[in-house]
């Protein structure tokens, strides 16, 4: 099973492609897309192009994206929402099921600490995956992919089922990553 993790951002978009075979995790590819100092629309276009190329190269079966952090300023949340939209569109265009996880859930699954800092995320990526991420965006993206793999509640369908059928079966059997306990219908 190969999963793409995306840590969206308009200035730096981290990505991590992680493969799982049994209990073994392997980094297929990871890095950070840095579109440069351009107007917003052009930065988002470059991120979309980079994610499209990455998906074509790595051929993940599913994508996982970090959800918006609610404590951000309204302007930061808007910009992050636009970058998330690009990440979601790239995955949807490739036909990948997309799963979203809260930052604290990702940190808990990756480090065992839901409030882990950037240094702890980088250290865990080195220790757990043997990766050497240069930026926290890359480590976060790897963590998002690992979190998704940890949350999967089933085995991958047998070989020969085909990529599309395997992806549909995977999406149908996943547990929700969060539940709404507010009681509203």
Curated annotation (Swiss-Prot):
Its main location: cytoplasm. GO terms for biological process: DNA recombination; DNA repair. This is Crossover junction endodeoxyribonuclease RuvC. It comes from the Bacteria. Keywords: Cytoplasm, DNA damage, DNA recombination, DNA repair, DNA-binding, Endonuclease, Hydrolase, Magnesium, Metal-binding, Nuclease. GO terms for cellular component: cytoplasm; Holliday junction resolvase complex. The keyword DNA-binding applies. The active site is at residues 7, 66, 137. NCBIfam families: ruvC. PANTHER family: CROSSOVER JUNCTION ENDODEOXYRIBONUCLEASE RUVC. One of its GO terms (molecular function) is magnesium ion binding. It is found in: Cytoplasm. Transmembrane segments: none annotated. It is an enzyme of class 3 (hydrolase). Binds 2 Mg(2+) ion per subunit. It catalyses: Endonucleolytic cleavage at a junction such as a reciprocal single-stranded crossover between two homologous DNA duplexes (Holliday junction). Pfam families: RuvC (PF02075). Homodimer which binds Holliday junction (HJ) DNA. The HJ becomes 2-fold symmetrical on binding to RuvC with unstacked arms; it has a different conformation from HJ DNA in complex with RuvA. In the full resolvosome a probable DNA-RuvA(4)-RuvB(12)-RuvC(2) complex forms which resolves the HJ. Mg(2+) 2 binds at residue 66. Its cofactor is Mg(2+). Belongs to the RuvC family. Mg(2+) 1 binds at residues 7, 137. The RuvA-RuvB-RuvC complex processes Holliday junction (HJ) DNA during genetic recombination and DNA repair. Endonuclease that resolves HJ intermediates. Cleaves cruciform DNA by making single-stranded nicks across the HJ at symmetrical positions within the homologous arms, yielding a 5'-phosphate and a 3'-hydroxyl group; requires a central core of homology in the junction. The consensus cleavage sequence is 5'-(A/T)TT(C/G)-3'. Cleavage occurs on the 3'-side of the TT dinucleotide at the point of strand exchange. The keyword DNA repair applies. Its EC number is 3.1.21.10.
């Amino acid at each position: 099973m190969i999963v793409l993790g995306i840590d969206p951002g308009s200035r730096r978009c981290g990505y991590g492609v992680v493969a799982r075979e049994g209990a073994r995790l392997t980094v297929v590819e990871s890095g950070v897309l840095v579109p440069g100092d351009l107007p917003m629309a052009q930065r988002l276009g470059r991120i979309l192009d980079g994610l499209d190329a990455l998906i074509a190269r790595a051929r993940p079966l599913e994508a996982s994206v970090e959800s918006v952090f609610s404590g951000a300023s309204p302007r930061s949340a808007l910009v992050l929402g636009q970058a998330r939209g690009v990440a979601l569109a790239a995955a949807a265009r490739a036909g990948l099921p997309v799963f979203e996880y809260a930052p604290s859930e990702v940190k808990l699954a990756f480090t065992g600490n839901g409030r882990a800092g950037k240094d702890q995320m980088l250290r865990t990526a080195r220790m757990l995956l043997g990766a050497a991420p240069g930026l926290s965006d890359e480590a976060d993206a790897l963590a998002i992919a690992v979190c998704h793999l940890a949350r999967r509640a089933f085995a991958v369908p047998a070989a020969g089922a085909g990529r599309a059928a395997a992806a549909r079966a995977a999406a149908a059997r996943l547990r929700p990553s969060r539940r709404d306990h507010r009681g509203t219908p």
